Amino acid sequence: MGRIRQTFIKRAGEDLVEKYEDRLTTDFETNKKVIDEVAEIATKRLRNRVAGYVTKKMKKVDA
């Protein structure tokens, strides 16, 4: 079984996908850079978790 992401990570990721869907891709590294530019996220670890969630959401949209 996989790990469950915390609610605030999901909420932040869904807000970012809603606002910046045109800038986000299915590539994790690109999404990290975009999130750095558009969002105020306190730590690198939290940014990476949000970027991973956003990447997963974008892959579902493409499928």
From Swiss-Prot:
Pfam families: Ribosomal_S17e (PF00833). One of its GO terms (biological process) is translation. GO terms for cellular component: cytosol; ribonucleoprotein complex; ribosome. It comes from the Archaea. One of its GO terms (molecular function) is structural constituent of ribosome. PROSITE patterns: RIBOSOMAL_S17E. Keywords: Ribonucleoprotein, Ribosomal protein. Belongs to the eukaryotic ribosomal protein eS17 family. NCBIfam families: PRK01151.1. HAMAP family: Ribosomal_eS17 (MF_00511). This is Small ribosomal subunit protein eS17. It comes from Methanococcus aeolicus (strain ATCC BAA-1280 / DSM 17508 / OCM 812 / Nankai-3). The lineage of its organism: Archaea, Methanobacteriati, Methanobacteriota, Methanomada group, Methanococci.
